[in-house]
């Protein structure tokens, strides 16, 4: 399998179509928010998009998983939260739009994303997990991510129920160092520009082990606004 940086408009359009299909399969029918303050299409346009393919001859239409990555120089932070100004914007990354259409494919494309981030001297990596409906929390927890602030509304997408609530999570410090080290040991080959990562057998990424006693760290307290929103949606 291989992970490719999607460089053409056609490839990136296929990514967006597959992302939408993955969300619809999970019954999360989101639409892009585009107004004077927020533009989800601009966010994706500024991001690097990566797609997973079963082999080097696979066309764009055969993309089976994907994810988006940007640093804060490429596009501003998408959700509010604790201060990160102690680090250069180019060293703080956001991972988003992580989707998969095949078992295990989501993990493989994330391995590709980890390799891309690890080679850029990262200081922090952010992700936003859907509150109450994300099946990725266990995976991100195993990678070393921890909650970062309280749940917030992700205003770049909306559904009939309004803006989705997400839990910001962050990878930093020792956990990030372990990810960088583990990424360098993954079995892959690439070109000089790192535009394509071809995986060899034995792909496995386990940089961080979370003690079961600390699992409670993911049981974050929600804001009153989130609780009120959930009560309103339940009564709708």
Model segments located where?
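Extended, composition-driven regions rather than compact fold-specific motifs
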Residues: 29-30, 45-46, 51, 62-63, ...
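Short, surface-exposed beta-strand/loop "edge" segments at domain boundaries and coil↔beta transitions
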Residues: 58-60, 137-138, 176-179
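C-terminal "cap" of GNAT-fold acetyltransferases
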Residues: 156-192, 199, 204-208, 214-215
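Acyl-donor binding region in acyl/amide transferases
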Residues: 79-165
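C-terminal/domain-terminus segments
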Residues: 10, 117-123, 184-202, 226-228, ...
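Conserved N-terminal entry element of GNAT/NAT acetyltransferase domains
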Residues: 1-13, 197-208
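A conserved beta-strand-loop-helix scaffold within acyl/acetyltransferase catalytic domains
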Residues: 3-93, 99, 151
């Amino acid at each position: 399998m291989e992970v490719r940086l999607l460089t053409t408009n056609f490839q990136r359009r296929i990514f967006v179509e597959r992302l939408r299909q993955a969300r619809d399969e999970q019954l999360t029918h989101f639409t892009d928010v585009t107004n004077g303050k927020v533009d989800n299409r601009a966010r994706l346009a500024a991001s690097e998009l990566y797609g997973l393919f079963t082999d080097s001859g696979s066309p764009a239409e055969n993309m089976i998983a994907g994810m988006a990555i940007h640093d804060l120089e490429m596009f501003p932070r998408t959700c509010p939260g604790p201060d990160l100004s102690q680090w250069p914007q180019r060293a703080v990354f956001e991972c988003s739009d992580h989707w998969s259409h095949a078992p295990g494919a989501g993990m493989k494309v994330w391995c590709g994303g980890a390799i891309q981030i690890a080679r850029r001297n990262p200081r922090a990596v952010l992700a936003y997990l859907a509150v109450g409906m994300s099946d990725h929390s266990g995976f991100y927890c195993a990678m070393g991510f921890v909650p970062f602030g309280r749940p917030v509304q992700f205003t770049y997408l909306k559904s009939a129920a309004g803006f989705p609530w997400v839990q910001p999570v962050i990878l930093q410090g020792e956990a990030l160092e372990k990810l960088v080290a583990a990424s360098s040991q993954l079995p892959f080959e690439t070109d000089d520009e790192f535009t394509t990562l071809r995986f060899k057998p034995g792909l496995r990424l386990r940089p961080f082990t979370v003690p079961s006693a600390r699992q409670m760290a993911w049981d974050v307290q929600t804001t009153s606004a989130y609780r009120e929103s959930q009560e309103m949606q339940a009564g709708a």
